From Swiss-Prot:
Organism taxonomic ancestry: Bacteria, Pseudomonadati, Pseudomonadota, Betaproteobacteria, Burkholderiales
Catalysed conversion reaction: (2R,3S)-3-isopropylmalate = (2S)-2-isopropylmalate
Keyword vocabulary terms for this entry: Amino-acid biosynthesis, Branched-chain amino acid biosynthesis, Leucine biosynthesis, Lyase
Single Gene Ontology MF annotation: 3-isopropylmalate dehydratase activity
Domain of life, per lineage: Bacteria
Pfam families referenced in this protein's UniProt entry, alphabetically: Aconitase_C
Function: Catalyzes the isomerization between 2-isopropylmalate and 3-isopropylmalate, via the formation of 2-isopropylmaleate.
Enzyme class: lyase
Gene name as annotated: leuD
Family affiliation: Belongs to the LeuD family. LeuD type 1 subfamily.
Name of the protein: 3-isopropylmalate dehydratase small subunit
EC numbers, comma separated: 4.2.1.33
Length: 217
């Protein structure tokens, strides 16, 4: 998992409440057992004019010109600005996979669905909760200025405009912050203790060989 320390990027405004996980990545794309390749199908039903299916050549599909992510001014956006209760609906880890593989590193909203919020941290995507008033202000700024950018400083727990004129502090649990700063997912955290795990396994086999299908002589 990539480290998240400080990130500066273009902001894309998704001005919708209650965006559910089926909108983020529709159910037909959940058949894949791989963790990659979901980016082209993020927001598939809003992003394209036709019905998407796994295995399609997305480069040949007709784009919806009215969808925000298809507008030229938001191309290359890496910070998603949206409204309350983002990520609601059924639990699917494919949702943060799709957003991250699209290119987003952070999502700013007044609130998130709990399971989606937790899944974001496990996959290196930073969900940031700001007040509705702060989010409203950021929407106004994003609409007003082409290529509007923000800097997300996880170490200092602050979102700021690139000129440094405005700052928005945010909260994040210390353990989640530690994992993102160091690029640790669940597997990475476990592997940090690989020596102790091997030592435990060796001692367990010696003391309880029957648990390792070894004959006791």
């Amino acid at each position: 998992m990539d480290k998240f320390i400080v990130h500066t990027g273009v902001v894309a405004p998704l001005d919708r409440e209650n965006v559910d996980t089926d909108a983020i990545i529709p159910k037909q794309f959940l058949k894949s057992i791989k963790r990659t390749g979901f980016g082209p199908n993020a927001f598939d039903e809003w992003r394209y004019l036709d019905h998407g299916e796994p295995g399609q050549d997305n480069s040949k599909r007709p784009l919806n010109p009215d969808f925000v992510l298809n507008q030229p001014r938001y191309q290359g956006a890496s910070i998603l600005l949206t409204r309350q209760n983002f990520g609601c609906g059924s639990s699917r880890e494919h949702a943060p996979w799709a957003l991250q593989q699209y290119g987003f590193r952070a999502i700013i909203a007044p609130s998130f669905a709990d399971i989606f919020y937790n899944n974001c941290f496990k996959n290196g995507l930073l969900p940031i909760v700001l007040t509705e008033q702060q989010v409203d202000h950021l929407f106004n700024e994003t609409f007003a200025f082409n290529g509007f950018q923000l800097t997300v400083d996880l170490e200092k727990q602050v979102v700021r405009t690139t000129d440094g004129g405005t700052e928005y502090p945010f909260e994040v649990a210390a353990f989640r912050k530690y994992c993102l700063l160091n690029g640790f997912d669940d597997i990475g955290l476990t592997l940090r203790h690989a020596d102790k795990i091997r030592q435990y396994e060796a001692e367990r086999i010696a003391k309880q060989p029957w648990l390792n299908n070894r004959l006791v002589r």
